[in-house]
Amino acid sequence: MAFAPDENDVLLVVDVQNDFCPGGNLPVPEGDRVVPVINALARRFRHVVLTQDWHPAGHQSFASSHAGRQPYEAIEVAYGPQVLWPDHCVQGTPGAAFRADLDIPHAALVIRKGFRPHIDSYSAFFENDRKTPTGLAGYLRERGLSRIFAVGLALDFCVRYSAEDARRQGFDVVVVDDACRGIDVGGSVKATRESFASLGIATARADLD
């Protein structure tokens, strides 16, 4: 689908941070290529929200926090399965910073997530325990923003969880494919697209070329 944002739309820019781009600790293939697309898209939107992965050192989701475990293994934690990741987006480190070429001066809000040591957080709306809200849903409703355009990294984790939670919260959701990249762990990109279709999450292309 093609699109033209209106006053009730918001651009949700997910985790465009150094550690998720080439050269970072948890790079998404071609993650840096979303930046110029997102910059151009953002100029179409009056309302923009950013998310930022913001982990303390020793976070439960880090493989290094579990003796004998390797990145991309899964373990069981209090709220269910947890994929273990390389250390990434540690608070105050260069890897946690937004990409320097991300140019969205009118972004109104930054949602930091994953800062609780024992709960991971993929979604912009809820921690992975599925009970702890970030406050984003209320922020959007208070401003009459009813349709979310989701972009960023990684398509099959933080973008996916954010889009799904937004849909379940009653928002209309569009994922802009060419402004996302996936990491694809065990077929997770395919599963993401199937989930979007089942939940009524639309997809679009910015097609800025």
Cite the ranges covered by each PLM segment.
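Short, well-ordered alpha-helix to beta-strand connector turns
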Residues: 8, 45, 106-107, 170, ...
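Active-site alpha/beta core segments
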Residues: 36-147
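Short glycine-enriched, charge-decorated loop/helix-capping segments at active-site entrances
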Residues: 22-31, 124-128
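Short, hydrophobic/glycine-enriched beta-strand segments
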Residues: 9-16, 20
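Short acidic-hydrophobic, aromatic-tinged amphipathic segments that line or gate anion-handling sites
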Residues: 202-209
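Short, flexible loop segments at boundaries between secondary-structure elements
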Residues: 174-189
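Active-site flanking residues adjacent to catalytic metal/cofactor-binding acidic residues
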Residues: 14, 52, 177
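Histidine-anchored nucleotide/phosphate-binding helix
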Residues: 37-41, 159-170
